[in-house]
Amino acid sequence: MGEHVIALNKKAKFNYEILETWEAGIELYGPEIKSIRNHEANIAEAFILIRKKEAFLINANIKKYDYANFVKGIDPLRTRKLLLHKKEINKILKRVMLEKLTIVPLRLYLKGNYAKLEIGLGRGKKIHDKRETIKKRDIERKEMRKYKY
């Protein structure tokens, strides 16, 4: 089963130092999975909260599927439950509370017939760390240009 990436959160790796990642399923309605298959999803502004030992994806934009005749109107920015094992949720929650870390969505992808979300535990970068990242990226680009010509 191959993975087919639908949406990336590029800002997450720039703003956070990712320490650990997990794969989580997402609780979706039928028209939402069709929208995801049509690449009409955005997780750039999304974040993850844990309430009452359950993880939720908040502010992820999954467009309304045009051809669906769904009785309830689905809000594109609705809160969606993430499917994780209790042990995983407890481990994440413990690290968030003790080490003051943030849970960020990294990428949304299809694995077989299921939509999965890769979530990461990250520590916020300071401004000087971000500048270092930009410098490293520029150096790598210059190196690649040398080898290209």
Swiss-Prot record:
| GO BP annotations, alphabetical order | trans-translation
What PROSITE patterns is this protein classified in?
SSRP (PS01317)
One Pfam family linked to the record: SmpB
Superkingdom as given in the UniProt entry: Bacteria
Q: Which GO terms describe its cellular component?
A: cytosol
Q: Where in the cell is it found?
A: Cytoplasm
What keywords does the record list, in alphabetical order? Answer: Cytoplasm, RNA-binding
**Entry keyword annotation includes Magnesium:** no
User: What InterPro entries is this protein classified in?
Assistant: SmpB, SsrA-bd_prot, SsrA-bd_prot_CS
> What's a Gene Ontology MF term here?
RNA binding
Which N-terminal residues, if any, form the signal peptide?
A: none
Q: What does this protein do?
A: Required for rescue of stalled ribosomes mediated by trans-translation. Binds to transfer-messenger RNA (tmRNA), required for stable association of tmRNA with ribosomes. tmRNA and SmpB together mimic tRNA shape, replacing the anticodon stem-loop with SmpB. tmRNA is encoded by the ssrA gene; the 2 termini fold to resemble tRNA(Ala) and it encodes a 'tag peptide', a short internal open reading frame. During trans-translation Ala-aminoacylated tmRNA acts like a tRNA, entering the A-site of stalled ribosomes, displacing the stalled mRNA.
> Which NCBIfam families does this chain map to?
PRK05422.1, smpB
Q: So what family is this one in?
A: Belongs to the SmpB family.
What this protein is called in its record is SsrA-binding protein
Organism of this sequence: Mesoplasma florum (strain ATCC 33453 / NBRC 100688 / NCTC 11704 / L1) (Acholeplasma florum)
